[in-house]
């Protein structure tokens, strides 16, 4: 499971998800990407389940990049606990995702394989997503 090694504050305020992603909204490393269309908290377990689904489908070919990291702890109090007596203990870690954010990238596989792998990964996530291709400024260097 993904989580930070150390954090400055153990129990921060809960993060907001207003607005669109202004960073991380283009495919930069790979050729294909999976883009979020809704705001959400994505847990480290969901990221790991998506990663496993993708890598199992592409087998030994290609490379996968995870473009989000769960760096925010979400606290919870135990069940049937009276109110008060402080904030609960950190329960799990989330990545705050805004619409437009690229979640995963992939390279080294055909478009059909990438599309199917991303579809399998998207089923593990709690949001609507979209398959996107890399867009170069002056076209791709390999084309011509």
From Swiss-Prot:
PROSITE patterns: RIBOSOMAL_L16_1, RIBOSOMAL_L16_2. One of its GO terms (biological process) is translation. Residues 1-14 have a biased composition (Basic residues). Gene3D superfamilies: Ribosomal protein L10e/L16. Residues 1-25 are annotated as: Disordered. Binds 23S rRNA and is also seen to make contacts with the A and possibly P site tRNAs. HAMAP family: Ribosomal_uL16 (MF_01342). This is Large ribosomal subunit protein uL16. It comes from Moorella thermoacetica (strain ATCC 39073 / JCM 9320).
